[in-house]
């Protein structure tokens, strides 16, 4: 489960990230509560607007942020973004402590936080894979999610108590201090031990990433599922804060709900770390579980029963996000990883500006329970999309007389080897849905899926003359 800890760089990163993320969750709790109760009178629409401004920049700047993450030193990018976020937290703290903060000013700062995070997120996600060997990338992503959710377990509860005891301004001060842990960790990274980064031969930013994703039907499905739930189901600040008020709780009660959600989230992240690779079917089942758990939570009559169901909501949410993130990272061309992850983060974070205002309006007009049901319905639709794609992507053919079954679970890339090379690979039955790629056919070169053992090949297939066989399986339905 913890094999990525064998890398010194990842260990340093992990512990720095926990401290920084605790502060981040404390600040998130304080910001939501300030907008909902101090700057407005329980206005969920204003809270949705704040979330839209904070999470909108990743969508608007996706073409630039992904290219920056691919072209420049990711460690230095993170040093700049983390320092910027720390300075912004100090500014908000000063305005709150001097009692001059207004809703328009908070909206401006939310947008500034969003711009900084737009550059931080793809670089941060891609940098995780830079610190470990490729075979440990999925494990590192899952442990990174566990770190995030360990902080989510602690941060909101501590933040809620700090708001009641000290005031919201001091919570922003505390978050600014925790950024120092991440900055120190980045400075201690041994750059010589980072994984080499291949350069993509073609120039281009967003268009190159989009073209790559469009050529991958599996990624299109993953992005679609994550977008639906991200837009309508993952508006937890709105759901938890309005439900806390529904049950007549204060900031500490809201913080407890966020921490309870993190109990399930942490469990999901740790279980994901045990899996050796990300599977699309796990993503699909998690989406369905999220939909069911969300709808059930909306029906709970008491604060305690609602909190209990939130454990399952958190579990399914993080299982889905960790699986999707790991799948994207481990199946993407390393030279394009930053751009593809920028698109992924734009889908995850950029869905919020679309869904948060709608969720806020529904909560104001029909109550928070109705808004939660809408989010649950989005999870059911995402499950249906994943199930439909899996049904229609079953058996594929490499050629008419040599059939082999590809499942939808593999995260390892296809390897190009010399046709005369007699390399035995583990007979693991798993592979991604094949992707058509244009390759120049060179005599003596063939493509062999990693999951096919030499003993499984026919005598004809072992012969050198098979060098120019079709390198890509047929699409579904081409029997």
Regions found by a protein language model. Give the residues of each.
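Long, low-complexity, intrinsically disordered cytosolic termini of multi-pass membrane proteins
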Residues: 403-479
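Alpha-helical transmembrane-bundle signature of multi-pass membrane transport and export proteins
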Residues: 1-424, 477
């Amino acid at each position: 489960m913890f094999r990525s800890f064998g890398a010194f760089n990842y260990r340093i990163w992990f512990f720095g990230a926990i401290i920084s993320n605790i502060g981040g969750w404390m600040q998130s709790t304080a910001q939501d509560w300030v907008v909902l109760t101090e700057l407005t009178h329980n206005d969920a629409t204003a809270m949705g607007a704040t979330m839209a401004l904070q999470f909108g920049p990743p969508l608007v700047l996706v073409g630039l942020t992904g290219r920056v993450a691919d072209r420049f030193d990711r460690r230095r990018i993170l040093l700049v973004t983390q320092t910027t976020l720390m300075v912004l937290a100090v500014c908000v703290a000063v305005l709150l402590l001097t009692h001059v903060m207004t809703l328009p000013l908070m909206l401006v700062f939310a947008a500034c936080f969003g711009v900084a995070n737009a550059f931080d997120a793809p670089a941060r996600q891609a940098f995780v894979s830079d610190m470990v060997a490729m075979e440990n990338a999925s494990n590192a992503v899952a442990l990174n999610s566990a770190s995030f959710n360990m902080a989510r377990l602690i941060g909101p509860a501590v933040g809620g108590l700090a708001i009641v005891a000290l005031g919201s301004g001091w919570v922003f001060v505390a978050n600014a201090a925790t950024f120092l842990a991440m900055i120190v960790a980045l400075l201690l990274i041994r750059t010589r031990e980072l994984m080499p980064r291949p350069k993509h031969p073609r120039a281009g930013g967003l268009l190159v990433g989009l073209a790559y994703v469009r050529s991958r039907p599996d990624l299109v499905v993953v992005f679609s599922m994550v977008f639906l739930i991200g837009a309508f189901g993952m508006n937890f600040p709105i759901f938890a804060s309005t439900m806390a008020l529904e049950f007549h709780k204060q900031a500490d009660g809201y913080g407890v709900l966020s921490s309870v959600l993190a109990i399930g989230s942490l469990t999901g992240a740790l279980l994901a770390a045990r899996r050796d690779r990300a599977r699309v079917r796990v993503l699909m089942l998690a989406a369905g579980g999220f939909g069911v758990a969300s709808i059930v939570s909306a029906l709970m009559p008491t604060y305690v029963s609602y909190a209990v169901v939130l454990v399952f909501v958190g579990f399914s949410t993080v299982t889905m996000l960790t699986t999707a993130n790991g799948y994207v990272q481990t199946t993407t061309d390393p030279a394009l990883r930053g751009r593809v992850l920028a698109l992924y983060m734009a889908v995850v974070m950029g869905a919020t500006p679309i869904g948060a205002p709608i969720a806020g309006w529904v909560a104001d007009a029909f109550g928070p329970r109705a808004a939660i049901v809408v989010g649950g319905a989005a999870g059911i639709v995402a499950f249906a999309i994943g199930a439909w794609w899996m049904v229609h992507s079953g058996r594929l053919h490499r050629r008419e007389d040599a059939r082999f079954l590809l499942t939808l679970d593999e995260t390892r890339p296809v390897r190009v080897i010399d046709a005369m090379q007699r390399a035995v690979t583990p007979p693991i039955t798993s592979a991604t849905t094949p992707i058509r790629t244009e390759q120049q056919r060179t005599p003596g070169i063939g493509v062999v899926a990693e999951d096919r053992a030499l003993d499984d090949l026919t005598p004809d297939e072992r012969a050198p003359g098979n060098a120019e066989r079709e390198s890509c399986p047929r699409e579904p339905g081409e029997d």
